[in-house]
Regions:
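Transmembrane alpha-helices and adjacent helix-loop boundaries
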Residues: 2-212
Length: 212
């Protein structure tokens, strides 16, 4: 009630021609944007879709990024003289994906997804989440790849010398050690995704900026 009374007083002063100072003017604008007519409820309606889109995009990014990272690491760690043609092709595709996605603007990718690939879809929020997830996957792949490559190569050699195959050694020895160095960077990626959700407003998706 005190805020409402103060707002009414300041608006009356402004209408009378009194120049408000910076703090008073800021208070009036804040009240109009968030408090008047319970507008904060509208913002709250935008927060839930924003978190929903972020969660979906991060899930897609982590899954896609993990696959790309594992393929590239497996290719780089092949023994000399043992080159798998299928793995070489998969590595080339993964490298092309990471290079193209990281080298093109997020906005362009969003527009291509909504106006070309899913031109007939009207679920703009999900299309935006998918575009964000594919974009995130390229960055997550480099994060995970860096974490895996940072583990001492002797760990892989030790596992193989004990009779474990490549997959078991990666799952039980290498990956658990890489997680510690990967988690902080993944936290940063989550923050970036949370901010990038504002881009889906361009294609008609609903989130916090759309609600605002």
């Amino acid at each position: 009630m005190r805020m409402a009374a103060q707002y009414e007083m300041l608006t009356q002063l402004a209408k009378a021609g009194t120049k408000l100072d910076f703090g008073q003017d800021l208070f009036v604008k804040f009240y109009q944007a968030f408090i008047a007519s319970n507008r904060w409820q509208q913002y709250l309606k935008g927060v839930i879709p924003t978190l929903y889109v972020t969660a979906i995009a991060l899930t897609i990014g982590v899954v896609l990024g993990s696959v790309v990272a594992l393929v590239r690491v497996a290719h780089d760690q092949q023994r000399r003289g043992h080159h798998d043609p299928a793995l070489a092709v998969a590595n080339a595709v993964c490298k092309l994906y990471a290079t193209v996605i990281r080298g093109t603007p997020m906005m362009v990718q969003m527009l291509i997804m909504s106006m070309v690939i899913f031109a007939n879809s009207r679920n703009f929020t999900m299309v935006g989440a998918l575009a964000l997830g594919i974009n995130s996957g390229a960055y997550v792949s480099e994060i995970i790849r860096g974490g895996l490559m940072a583990v001492d190569p002797g760990q892989m050699e030790a596992g193989r010398s004990l009779g474990l195959n490549y997959i078991t050694t990666m799952a039980l020895i290498v990956i658990p050690q890489a997680i510690r160095s990967v988690l902080p960077a993944l936290g940063n990626e989550f923050i970036v995704l949370l901010k990038d959700t504002s881009l889906i407003t361009v294609i008609g998706g609903k989130e916090l900026l759309y609600a605002a």
